[in-house]
Amino acid sequence: MAEESGDASAALAALIAVAHADPASVGVRGRMLEQALIVGDQRRATEAAQLLWQAGEQRFDARMVLLVDAVQRGDWADARSLVQVDGAKTGLDLTGRLISPVVLAWIDVAARERDPARHLVRFGRIGDDQTPLWIGATILLLAGDRNAAVGQAETLNLNHRTSRVVAARLAATFAKRGDGAAASALATRLAGAPGDGLVARLSIPPVADARQGIGHWLALLGDGFARTPGGSNELSLLFTRAGQWLDPADPFGQIALAEALVQAKQVDGALAVLERGAAGAGAGNPFALRRAELLAERGEVDHAVAVAMPASGVLPTDRAWLTRFADVARRAKDPAVGEAVFDRLLALINDGEDDGELRAALFIAKADIRIKQGRWAEARPLLEAALAAGPNDPGTLNFVGYSALERRENIPLALARVEAAWLGDPANAAITDSLGWAYVVTGDVARGVPLLERAARGEPANAVINEHLGDAYWKSGRFIEARYSWRAAALVADDAMAGRLAAKLAGGLTEATLAP
């Protein structure tokens, strides 16, 4: 029952009790291993993996847990033997391409073998992604060949997210070893590299030894599975958990583990990982921001804002951070929170064409606050500013036009804007609804109904669309279909809409109950 409900801690406790009664049960130990990986109980995971291995059940997850244990103990011979197990026997043959080259190279570093980077020759790169070669530069440095490490790093690009993360760890490792010139040169390259700014917001530590190097690689693999459409949730969790057991101070690994837990529907576990990562991480850190996003997703918006807002109350100047925080802050009960974020972002972005869409979205967000407070006169100039910033953006045109239509203000201009929005994005159900409803409120019901029907097919559970369609049907004399649409809307309506729908279902459509 606990496994089915997603309560991994309760499931693990129950399985431990069963295992005491039936210690030789391979099936129970397999389930114990799975739940221990979710919870993060390395001791229980290792016990289960050992029993499975001894029973001849050489599962891939058991093999990875035993590899982590061997690396932590410094038993490099055992670690090497686990890496070199025939992949066909463990039920998952990922070793040849993903795991063994890097792990064997790090094992050679620890065992002081010659030329550990030789293992990476058959790895190379994956397309334009040079992450394995960046790993190779780090291995060369820890193997004592500083010049080769510098030379290899100078030839590599920083086009991929994981390449930038590994390069940042290499720069930190150069710095830790007193090689300021190499560290500074690499840091300069990173500062000018593309990306979402994650590396700059994380305090990336150096790689001190083979254990951390292997842990870092496993975290990178887990992150890759988490971000690949259709990627394996189980492998993402297995690799990120193993990576954190080996390299618990790696902030990138902490972020990757949290995402793997979210994918496994273990949001409480992800929140706990992020809370630990945020401790002492400073203002504008990605741990607090991601934690806030998860809290907001389950309705704890004000708690989310408090979590992400820096203790000083001073917002950072990181555009990527502010853009994500704005999506949380706009839902806060206190509109001043959202206003502060929007204003900080507006002050940071330029008037150039590339920033027009973001500027338009921010003006829309500021206007939306005033609209919800009944301050339409103050919202109007903000809406016009949004159109000036994004004159051809369908979403902006639709919001501005529909907002005016709701208030029956300057209907010809409002209708023209919604029509322009629909021409720009005719597949958008919300915009299609806006145009259909615009025709209805301007008296062209026959033209509006087909558009509203199309919108309802696109978003059949949308209360606003179904109410609009019901009203249009009633105006067309299609009373049975109108009530059907109103009932569909009532299933998901908010409190304000529910009363209006109840009145229509009881007595039909009137001017007083017409949708806004």
Task: Place the predicted regions along the sequence by residue.
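Solenoidal tandem-repeat scaffolds enriched in leucines and small polar residues
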Residues: 107-148, 152-153, 163-165, 169, ...
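Alpha-helical, heptad-rich or low-complexity scaffold/stalk segments
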Residues: 1-75, 90-92, 138, 142, ...
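Alpha-helical repeat scaffolds
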Residues: 14-16, 42-54, 76-90, 113-126, ...
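Terminal, low-structured helical/coil segments at or just beyond the last alpha-helical repeat
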Residues: 211, 463, 475-516
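Residue-level recognition of tetratricopeptide repeat
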Residues: 34, 68, 102, 106, ...
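Generic helix N-cap/helix-start motif at coil->alpha-helix transitions
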Residues: 7, 22-29, 44, 56-65, ...
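Alpha-helical adaptor scaffolds
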Residues: 293, 399-457
